[in-house]
Amino acid sequence: MRINPTTSGPGVSTLEEKNQGRIVQIIGPVLDVAFSPGKMPNIYNALIVKGQDTVGQQINVTCEVQQLLGNNRVRAVAMSATDGLTRGMEVIDTGAPLSVPVGGATLGRIFNVLGEPVDNLGPVDTRTTSPIHRSAPAFIQLDTKLSIFETGIKVVDLLAPYRRGGKIGLFGGAGVGKTVLIMELINNIAKAHGGVSVFGGVGERTREGNDLYIEMKESGVINEQNLAESKVALVYGQMNEPPGARMRVGLTALTMAEYFRDVNEQDVLLFIDNIFRFVQAGSEVSALLGRMPSAVGYQPTLSTEMGSLQERITSTKEGSITSIQAVYVPADDLTDPAPATTFAHLDATTVLSRGLAAKGIYPAVDPLDSTSTMLQPRIVGEEHYETAQRVKQTLQRYKELQDIIAILGLDELSEEDRLTVARARKIERFLSQPFFVAEVFTGSPGKYVGLPETIRGFRLILSGELDGLPEQAFYLVGNIDEATAKAMNLDEESKLKK
């Protein structure tokens, strides 16, 4: 962390003495720069290209040194578009890595990868900045305490609970609800836990980033009147950005989160949407840097790049960073190297299922594929563990019977299996839940369900006490009392129709 005595631009540190070079080659977002002998910049140093294009427009491009090539040349990746750059342009070595503003000044604001505000709300206090490249906390600084992080979402809290200070992956293909689930988590956590969040939009749709910002202002997560009371800082490097920006924007967001953890000693939530785009950006740059591609065309440094980001996301004795990462799964293939590498770092996985989304069950979290290292009786308690296991067994049995039902029909099943199917269908529907952030689509008010209420509801379904209720009564409700009330309403409606 650096305390800057004077307020300078947020992207890089003050230039003490200018070490100048010249562009000798441009290949898309990758630049080769020649420096004087003995004046070579270090790896990860920020370089600034300043000049004018052919129509007299001012150019200001920041790059990051990736390789030292020999012959006094370095290869750097641009953090913004390289349009208008020409060979021979002057390049200045800043002598330090990219540094971004950190602390309370970042709350309620939107930044780009360089830490520059992009929300037209004026400049940000840049007296306290921090470099985006730093090592992970030492082993002795880590905190190993195990505790559950309640989200208020039934299917998550019961079957794949999140660890406070852990890493959670949201897996799913395109259009199954990852971003909506992330927005709901930000909303619930800000309201129920009062925690500070940092949101890193890595290579996703600009429209979604804008929607999220407006949604946060409406829900009070961002306080427009007093930004210091906001609960989130936003860092965006969206789909339209060059790969250099998408590759580094995750580190910018993480740097801001680390300050809240290490200096302010807070529990922080770091959302990354989408970690796959981080890998994809690295893959785009990798070939231009002259590396041979690895499996399925990914960069050979995939594991190293992922590890350097993920190992910094951890709990220390000062505070914690709980990270929730959306993971796009290419062609719904979980064995693809990008999602497979991400799996190794996670404490819990929330897998979204296209089949459930097609049935209209939202959140479309697959109760059998989603896992958590926290679902152990010594951590969550016997009652929670036993209820979760029985729910999974019932749903697994229903899955096994589906082929028989499709061929022969329900009537060919034994009495016991018919009862299992009926309860499984109720459980499946009760795992759905109306979201606060989806009120505009569904027209139903959102529900936050505490863990004790969630366990009580599923125990009642498993016990058979609610066997007489219609299964549609369990669809898109909060706790079990709402389901029984809905059943009574349905009963009255059917009587009126008769």
Swiss-Prot record:
Tell me which Gene Ontology terms the entry assigns under biological process.
Answer: proton motive force-driven mitochondrial ATP synthesis
Q: Name one GO cellular component term.
A: mitochondrion
**Record keywords:** ATP synthesis, ATP-binding, CF(1), Chloroplast, Hydrogen ion transport, Ion transport, Membrane, Nucleotide-binding, Plastid, Thylakoid, Translocase, Transport
SUPFAM superfamilies for the chain: C-terminal domain of alpha and beta subunits of F1 ATP synthase, N-terminal domain of alpha and beta subunits of F1 ATP synthase, P-loop containing nucleoside triphosphate hydrolases
Q: Does the keyword Chloroplast apply?
A: yes
Membrane topology, from the record:
Peripheral membrane protein
Please write the reaction equations for the catalytic activity of this protein: ATP + H2O + 4 H(+)(in) = ADP + phosphate + 5 H(+)(out)
Q: How does it assemble?
A: F-type ATPases have 2 components, CF(1) - the catalytic core - and CF(0) - the membrane proton channel. CF(1) has five subunits: alpha(3), beta(3), gamma(1), delta(1), epsilon(1). CF(0) has four main subunits: a(1), b(1), b'(1) and c(9-12).
Give the UniProt family note.
Answer: Belongs to the ATPase alpha/beta chains family.
List, alphabetically, the HAMAP family matched.
Answer: ATP_synth_beta_bact
UniProt-recorded name of the protein: ATP synthase subunit beta, chloroplastic
Please give the organism: Piper cenocladum
Taxonomic lineage is:
Eukaryota, Viridiplantae, Streptophyta, Embryophyta, Tracheophyta
- The gene for this chain is atpB
